[in-house]
Amino acid sequence: RASQTAAVIGGQLALPPVELGGIHEVQVGRLENRNDDEAVAEFNAIYERWHRGELEVPLPGGETGSEVLDRYLPVLTELRLRYLDDHDFHGDIVVVSHGAAIRLAAAVLAGVEADFALDHHLDNAQSVALTPITDGRWSCVRWGTLTPPFYPEAAEIPATPVADAVRSTTDPMG
């Protein structure tokens, strides 16, 4: 699907899409072609661990988060060095990929909080916009339909904290 999306975007921009090695979906191993609840839950649990810094955890028979980033980020760095850091280049680069890889790479590059990245999936054909800033760093200027600041969804607060406290059998004074 990413190739088809790239072809549509390329057609709109009158530019041929270019396939770049390293930019592709997460290799999910034994979870490939499965969409049952167990497979989705297993993927989501491991993917969450990646966002929380446990990048060496592999998908069953598939990639680790480190392997995804090790193939994906150098391509983005090369594009940045070749085009975006060149003061004679005055345009944008569109990289078409898959949501899980995009969210992981963008969160790492731009320092987007794990909870936000996990709470905000990208719909088909949605994008994340990164812009280069100083010292090789990136800033995330759009995530799907959202713009900064990027905060995780607020945790639900009990609707009746006073009533819940009154019903408690524990003496709040000690």
Regions found by a protein language model. Give the residues of each.
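Loop-to-helix element that buttresses phosphate recognition and phosphoryl-transfer chemistry
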Residues: 1-9, 55-75
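Short glycine/proline- and acidic residue-enriched helix-loop micro-motifs
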Residues: 46-67, 164-171
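Active-site signature of alpha/beta-hydrolase-fold catalytic machinery across serine-
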Residues: 8, 104-108
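Acidic, low-complexity terminal tails and accessory targeting/binding regions
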Residues: 15, 26-38, 81, 85-91, ...
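Glycine-rich phosphate-binding loops at beta-strand->alpha-helix junctions
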Residues: 1, 101-102
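Phosphate-coordination/substrate-recognition cap region in phosphate-metabolizing enzymes
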Residues: 1-47
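Short, conserved phosphate/pyrophosphate- and ester-handling motifs at nucleotide-, phospho-/glycolipid
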Residues: 98
